[in-house]
Amino acid sequence: MKAVILAAGTATRLRPLTDTVPKCLLPIGITTMLGMTLDNLLQNGVKEYVIVTGYREEQIRDFVAARYPGLDVSFLTNTRFAETNNIYSLWLTRELLAGQTMLLLDSDIVFDPGIVALLLHSGHENCLAVLRSKTLDTEEIKVRTDSAGAIREISKEVDPSTAFGESIGIEMFSPRFVGRLFGLLEQKIVLRKQVNQFYEAAFQEVIDGGESIFAVDVGSLPCLEVDTPEDLNAARAFVGSTSRFAKNKRWP
């Protein structure tokens, strides 16, 4: 199993905070979003990592080297970060993920480590974390499921009234699914030049081709995607009020 963390974007909605710092390294209490993600994965026994960087990538590499010496991590650079979306960053990992189970995470999520445990112990080879405890609108990536919990539709365009919940950007896929996914990404990126989509567009095509991804409800476990200054303030308030994040041996 390898964890893939996508951290290439410029985070324009958080400017000027991200003028000189990548979003995943903005301070969140005594940590950062990337630091929290790595800590949560390590707590769940994940040992191998792939981080896709782009914007201000040297800061991310320096951060990981300083805070996580000895971590088994490979870095890949999305040199086209200013003109592509996360589907392209994911495609860059194809050689390192061949034959591997993949845990895929966006780098701008503040979340409870129990969410990773839910996926690992869900009983599903292919699944993603879904938040149901919020009002949905057009901004979120939403999922619609069948009666067995398999996802039938995933996109921002899913009707909120029929949606099971919001996909929060944490997924787990089997080696077989990973092979199918990267085969499709090769077509989308190389042949169709669809480099500026969300990776959920590829998930949808794999689902339409007969594969299943199951929705795992995170229940009351907290999670928050940070896109705006308001989100960042909410994330900082959450971390500041949660005792288990108050002390970490990796932080001063």
Q: Where are the model-predicted features located?
A:
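Short catalytic helix/loop segments, enriched in acidic residues and glycine
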Residues: 20-35
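Conserved core of the sugar-phosphate nucleotidyltransferase
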Residues: 112-189
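Conserved alpha/beta core of the MobA/IspD/sugar-nucleotide pyrophosphorylase nucleotidyltransferase superfamily
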Residues: 1, 164-252
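Conserved N-terminal catalytic core of the sugar/cofactor nucleotidyltransferase
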Residues: 2-5, 31-101, 191-193
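N-terminal nucleotide-binding beta1-loop-alpha1 segment
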Residues: 1-18
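Conserved beta-loop-beta/alpha segment of the NTase-like Rossmann-fold superfamily
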Residues: 68-141, 145
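Conserved beta-strand segments of alpha/beta enzyme cores
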Residues: 24, 72-74, 150, 212-214
